[in-house]
Amino acid sequence: MDVMMQFSRERLEQDASFSAIYVVYHGFQSWICIFAPVLTALPVLAVKLSETESGLTRFVSVRLNHKKKLTGVCNFYLLAGATVLVTGFLLFCLITFAFFPSLNRYSVDSVYQINSQLYPDGSMIGTAYHKGGAPAAFLLYLSGLFLYGISCNAIILFCSSLSNNMYVITCLPFFFHYSCERISTLLSINLAENTSKTIHRIVNALNPNAFVHSFLYPVDHFWIWTYHSVRTALCIIAFIAICKRRSRYDFLI
């Protein structure tokens, strides 16, 4: 929106970096660390608020001792949060394509240059683009975004087992993501050049944006996916353990 207010349509059509598809991929990822924890928390907040207003909080807490109920709640929170994130991205795409020029309006050289930046060789999205074109690359990115939503919502899932307070459920995951992003960035800057590549890769994997970047750029996927998988699994295990304990001793914040 700020770009649209500062530049005319003619100015936007002179620079291919203002093309809609470029803004979609590189504009959204710069804000994903901020918006992902908030968007993925919406289904959890909706359920918690409905439980509080209906006065069924303690009843639900007791039912969470049932294995099927607990599994259903866990799956709903994870999948619903990821779906909200993908839906938010699709709305962003619609707005972007409505206000920014199509890539086809630029010269052949500009299109080639932008495509080489959007779909670099050796990246997952680049491989998908060369095999199935732009639709395949876009679907791959949506899949990665969905998985990232599950990873983000796992932390929210854990926080929801500790408290029913909406500020705790929203702010703690946001603080965690922002802190990890800042710590990873500072460590990456201050690491000496003679530090082993493995340490560099581990530090980079701590960055919340690294998971999305693993689909867009030719990076080492092992440490990034391992970190997010382990983090998600630990959050789910902690959620199940805490909810079972809550159902027995009935403590709520």
Stretches with model-predicted labels:
Residues 2-51, 75-153, 157, 161, ...:
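Secretory targeting signals
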Residues 158-162, 229-253:
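Junction motif at the cytosolic side of a transmembrane helix
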Residues 93-108, 165, 189-196, 243-252:
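Transmembrane helix-loop junctions in multipass membrane proteins, especially transporters and channels
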Residues 77, 174-178, 232:
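Residue-level recognition of pore/gate-forming positions within transmembrane alpha-helices
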Residues 64-78:
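Amphipathic cytosolic juxtamembrane alpha-helices at the membrane-cytosol interface
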Residues 166-180:
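Central hydrophobic cores of alpha-helical transmembrane segments
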Residues 44-62, 66:
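Transmembrane helix boundary and interhelical loop/hinge segments in multi-pass membrane proteins
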Residues 65-67, 149, 165-169:
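Membrane-helix interface segments
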